[in-house]
Design a protein with these regions (language model features):
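Residue(s) in the substrate-gating loop at a strand-loop-helix junction
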Residues: 177
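SDR active-site lid
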Residues: 210-301
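The beta1-alpha1 cofactor-binding region of Rossmann-like NAD(H)/NADP(H)-dependent oxidoreductases
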Residues: 75, 96-107, 139
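Conserved glycine-rich cofactor-binding loop
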Residues: 43, 50-51
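Conserved glycine-rich Rossmann-like NAD(P)H-binding loop of the short-chain dehydrogenase/reductase
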Residues: 65-81
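Active-site helix of classical SDR
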Residues: 157, 193
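Substrate-binding pocket helix/loop in short-chain dehydrogenase/reductase
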Residues: 133-134, 138-146
Length: 345
């Protein structure tokens, strides 16, 4: 009888969880006409605009007739994106920037204010990773992850807040990850950096509130694993091509970023998988950590095809991986077909 009651409780519990995730999924919907009109004429700074979420957000902002300051290391690619924005009705300024270098981040801030006189939204989007067993990844590569993902966000956040305090308002958006609550096996330094970004944003938001800057908001966007060039650009010491189960499409994250630039919220897990992961991390932390680690073992160490070790885009930009998405999901489907074919043979 007790087991039956427990099973009934668990069914109801997970049904309620799924309902919560479904009903809170509107943040991933595309902006309506009213939201698009609110963005028109606003100035957005995007550091990490050359691919992935950054490129997706930039191109959408162009369609909504925003002013966009594009910053990343791949200047020629930024110029292409700037042309797309201008052809869509927006305006754009390109600034070459490595977010780990404070003087280059400051140059982005100065260019934005000089050109547009204000910054409404500043987005720290640049990010790198180093995947593999912690003891097999060179220490300098892991430090580089911290240089970009944490120190770079400190430089970007400081530059943004300096502008916002002078003008009296603004929205700072830092891109985090579900890894901030559920550290992922074989992503040790990346998970550490994203946990730090979450706490940086929360602490900064409280400092602004306590000092009377109520019109300055700080947002942390926390996606699930997403099909972007991040996987191609990450340093990889696994011996295979690492991926993740149930990857999301980048448009979900792009839409969430744009929505929260208008209606800021402290922490934004994107989509039902990220929300479920956050819930499990807080309610069933041991179980969640165990399941996530096992999934990572399968998808990032055992199942993918072999690949050579690489430093990816840690130290210098790569030619490959220019789009918003990177076709990871399609490659996974093809790999599954090949495995099934080999089993039959």
């Amino acid at each position: 009888m007790a087991i039956k009651t427990l099973l009934q409780f668990m069914r109801g519990f997970f049904a309620a969880l799924l309902l919560l995730c479904f009903t809170t999924g509107c943040s991933t919907w595309k902006l309506g006409k009213s939201g698009q009109n609110k963005i028109a004429g606003k100035t957005y700074v995007i550091i990490g605009a050359s691919s992935g979420f950054g490129r997706g957000v930039a191109e959408e902002l162009g369609r909504y007739k925003a002013n966009v300051v594009l910053a990343a290391r791949r200047t020629e690619l930024l110029e292409e994106i700037a042309d797309t924005i201008r052809n869509s009705g927006g305006t754009a300024r390109v600034v070459t920037c490595d977010i780990s270098k404070p003087e280059e981040v400051q140059r982005v801030a100065e260019a934005a204010v000089t050109q547009y006189g204000k910054v409404d939204v500043w987005i720290n989007m640049a990010g790198v990773g180093a995947i593999g067993r912690f003891w097999e990844i060179p220490a300098e590569d892991q430090v580089r992850v911290i240089d970009v993902n944490l120190k770079g966000f400190i430089y970007g956040s400081r530059a943004a807040v300096d502008i916002f305090i002078k003008q009296g308002y603004g929205v700072l958006i830092n891109i985090g990850s579900v890894d901030s609550e559920t550290p992922l096996a074989y992503h040790a330094s990346y998970s550490a950096s994203k946990a730090a970004v979450r706490n940086l944003s929360l602490a900064l938001g409280q400092e602004l509130r306590l000092n009377g800057y109520k019109k300055i908001k700080v947002v942390t966007i926390e996606p699930w694993a997403v099909d972007t060039p991040w996987w191609r650009h990450a340093a990889n010491y696994t011996g295979v091509e690492p991926k993740m189960a149930l990857m999301d499409e980048p448009d979900k994250v792009v839409n969430a970023i744009l929505r929260k630039s208008l209606r800021p919220k402290k922490i934004v897990p994107v989509g039902w998988k990220a929300k479920a992961s956050s819930f499990m991390a807080n309610v069933f932390p041991r179980l969640n950590e165990h399941i996530t680690a096992n999934v990572s073992q399968r998808y990032q160490m055992e199942m993918p095809p072999a690949a050579p070790a690489t430093q990816g885009a840690l130290y210098k930009p790569m030619e490959e991986g220019k789009g918003v998405d990177d076709g990871v999901d399609e490659r996974m489907k093809e790999e599954k077909k090949m495995r099934n074919k080999q089993k039959k043979e």
